[in-house]
Amino acid sequence: MASQGTKRSYEQMETDGERQNATEIRASVGRMIGGIGRFYIQMCTELKLNDYEGRLIQNSLTIERMVLSAFDERRNKYLEEHPSAGKDPKKTGGPIYKRVDGKWVRELVLYDKEEIRRIWRQANNGDDATAGLTHIMIWHSNLNDTTYQRTRALVRTGMDPRMCSLMQGSTLPRRSGAAGAAVKGVGTMVLELIRMIKRGINDRNFWRGENGRKTRIAYERMCNILKGKFQTAAQRAMMDQVRESRNPGNAEIEDLTFLARSALILRGSVAHKSCLPACVYGPAVASGYDFEKEGYSLVGVDPFKLLQTSQVYSLIRPNENPAHKSQLVWMACNSAAFEDLRVSSFIRGTRVLPRGKLSTRGVQIASNENMDAIVSSTLELRSRYWAIRTRSGGNTNQQRASAGQISTQPTFSVQRNLPFDKTTIMAAFTGNAEGRTSDMRAEIIKMMESARPEEVSFQGRGVFELSDERATNPIVPSFDMSNEGSYFFGDNAEEYDN
């Protein structure tokens, strides 16, 4: 991308760093990971979890959510000002699962948020360590992306449910900062903007007064984030137009919907980071591994190496398939919800199935589910190869924007074609050619029409053996070019409900 030089790397966003060299970045990311690990160890001690219970992903999720809730200042302030019955705004908690007499039992724990904040800061050398909190948010977001389809959210804002490959990060909280903005898909940004514009249409005062000024700044900032994800001049010019509109309304909503559709072929650059559950970092720290000294990267070999040697367990419901549960978590750990299944399967070394073929529900267990028949099993999170995570969107050099199937946003920098059903996508563009942006629209449509599904993206890029940490010998896989590999295709995954 031309503007690469002006952007901070993911790791810098992740650690709030100014410009750092690679070694400093690796060290500061390592420091962040080590802090999460130390916090997790301390929480397991507080909760009296044994080693097995501490490696249970459901316990990890509860502990992670407790720390996020403890630091959610806006919500905490809101809860204190609007007390609701039976909810103590100063406390946080959730289900913790323990083995008792050969059965899994659920125990609801409650802690002072102040106490959780103290433990977190202590694990992070006295800092608030916002980067670590964001890292946990992105892990939760990646898990949601893998588990749920956002069709309902798309339909509500007037977008096509088949555009789910653009929805990465759609469940990230607003407070997730620059690192969070980097991993949001084009569809997610469009959705946020459309919601905002709709509020403005329905509420006369939304853009007015002191609050309205802040709203306007937020609107323009979101527009700029989205603009930065687009890689063609015409798409960016359209974003300028949306941003500069005096009074955003239906015309802007149409432009944004058009841009979202165009991103199925002229894909945006969306970052991918491997964020692992706290129960992976904890045991690694406990075994004496020094993340800060060794250095760590979220986009290289490190997460793969860590998963190779980690033992993580999960609770399994009676009719769930443990192998399918493993695939769900593997995809979340590798941020691969919208990657081509051909590529994921090659890297994992076992076939990765589309969501609709998986016999598994989400990882979390609802408080009303019966624990009697619930068992636990080891999650298989290892991989055969590793590959570098990308944020380019895989557009080919010829027109810097190429084939995108109606459902991929590449995660790994690995050579392949990106098959897509051009007729389906182009059909969405017939009709509405009038309007003030017809010249840019025409240019975008022309670029899309010239894109060919058989064109190869990530030319010459391959996967690497796990022993090849310096990425010296790329193994370029050959894929069946006609075969498309989209995860949510023709699917019946559950909807994500807050």
Swiss-Prot record:
Q: What is the recorded post-translational modification? A: Late in virus-infected cells, may be cleaved from a 56-kDa protein to a 53-kDa protein by a cellular caspase. This cleavage might be a marker for the onset of apoptosis in infected cells or have a specific function in virus host interaction.
Give the record's GO CC terms. helical viral capsid; host cell; host cell nucleus; ribonucleoprotein complex; viral nucleocapsid
| Keyword check for Coiled coil | no
- Provide the residue span(s) of the region labelled Disordered: 1-21
* Cited SUPFAM superfamilies: flu NP-like
Keywords, A to Z? Capsid protein, Helical capsid protein, Host nucleus, Host-virus interaction, Ribonucleoprotein, RNA-binding, Viral nucleoprotein, Viral penetration into host nucleus, Virion, Virus entry into host cell
Single GO MF descriptor: structural molecule activity
Q: Where is this motif: Unconventional nuclear localization signal?
A: 1-18
Major subcellular location class: virion
Q: Motif range for Bipartite nuclear localization signal?
A: 198-216
Localization terms from the record:
Virion; Host nucleus
Q: Which domain of life is it from?
A: Viruses
Q: Give the record's GO biological process terms.
A: symbiont entry into host cell; viral penetration into host nucleus
The UniProt regions of compositional bias labelled Basic and acidic residues, in chain numbering, are 8-21
The record, for Pfam families, names:
Flu_NP (PF00506)
Q: Which InterPro entries match?
A: Flu_NP
Function of the molecule = Encapsidates the negative strand viral RNA, protecting it from nucleases. The encapsidated genomic RNA is termed the ribonucleoprotein (RNP) and serves as template for transcription and replication. The RNP needs to be localized in the host nucleus to start an infectious cycle, but is too large to diffuse through the nuclear pore complex. NP comprises at least 2 nuclear localization signals that are responsible for the active RNP import into the nucleus through cellular importin alpha/beta pathway.
Q: Assembly state and interactors?
A: Homomultimerizes to form the nucleocapsid. May bind host exportin-1/XPO1. Binds to viral genomic RNA. Protein-RNA contacts are mediated by a combination of electrostatic interactions between positively charged residues and the phosphate backbone and planar interactions between aromatic side chains and bases.
**Similarity-based family:** Belongs to the influenza viruses nucleoprotein family.
User: This chain belongs to which protein, by name?
Assistant: Nucleoprotein
Species source reads: Influenza A virus (strain A/China:Nanchang/11/1996 H1N1)
Gene symbol here is: NP
